[in-house]
Amino acid sequence: MNRLDGKIAFVSGAARGIGAATARLMVDAGAKVAIGDLLDERGHETARSLKEAGGQSVYVHLDVTRADDWGAAIAATVAHFGGLDILVNNAGIFLAKDLEESTKADWERLCGVNLTGVILGTQTALPALRESGAASPQGSAIINLSSMVGLVGSAMAPLYSLTKGGITSFTKSMALEFARKRYRIRVNSIHPGIIDDEMGGQAIAARARMKGEADMELAHAQASAAHPIGRLGTVTDIAHGIVFLASDDAGFMTGSALVVDGGWTAQ
């Protein structure tokens, strides 16, 4: 039996990167997966590739900052697959500016995607997750994408760090609220280090600017070396952690922070 046999998942920001890798591993583990994103062409392509590989997947357009988009996306998922067991709040953006450079518009965009998106997703999916959780021995699951800088500070991206810290706190609060209300919904966060993908490239470029380093190849090597394990993370590294948190193997975990950062925060 596969780890997620019979489960139905929704993954936001899943047209590429960690989200797409998560959708792929979830399908491989037996789940039916709806993917939501703003990037319609890439999103349809990702869903199509999952179906061509023998999985069940559907793409829905989603702007995570809009409550009506969330309502339509979750409704479409439930209508298409018959329910919802897993929500992965993956969509996020990066801002590499210090406080003095940042504008109110920067903050509003960052907060809209990284915080409002997680809140709206959780709120909208809650009725479907409550229903499926009540019928499952280990309950349903929410996994929120935070960051290693949601646990420690960041000199190069303080407002990004603030939003990721907010996700960490929100995760713990929702775990406690749902437990108090006897909802069978587990809520956990995952905290990546620097990942070798598009957003990771933005983080490496920001570190290079902060250090006055113009050689991006050297900056990449320095970022790799900054992780005690000696390399950057991959999207698959994080996707494996998400699949674990979504599965019954994590049935005794709620309000937890799964750190997958190559040892960065151990220093």
What residue spans do the PLM features occupy?
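Short, small/polar-rich loop/turn modules that mediate ligand/substrate recognition or access, typified
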Residues: 179, 184-186, 253-255
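Alpha-helical segment proximal to the catalytic Tyr-Lys
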Residues: 127, 176-180, 251
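Residue(s) in the substrate-gating loop at a strand-loop-helix junction
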Residues: 147
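Active-site helix of classical SDR
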Residues: 122, 163, 171
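Canonical Rossmann dinucleotide-binding motif of NAD(H)/NADP(H)-dependent dehydrogenases/reductases
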Residues: 3-34
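Substrate-binding pocket helix/loop in short-chain dehydrogenase/reductase
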Residues: 98-99, 103-111, 223
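Short C-terminal tail/terminal secondary-structure segment
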Residues: 3, 152, 231, 241-244, ...
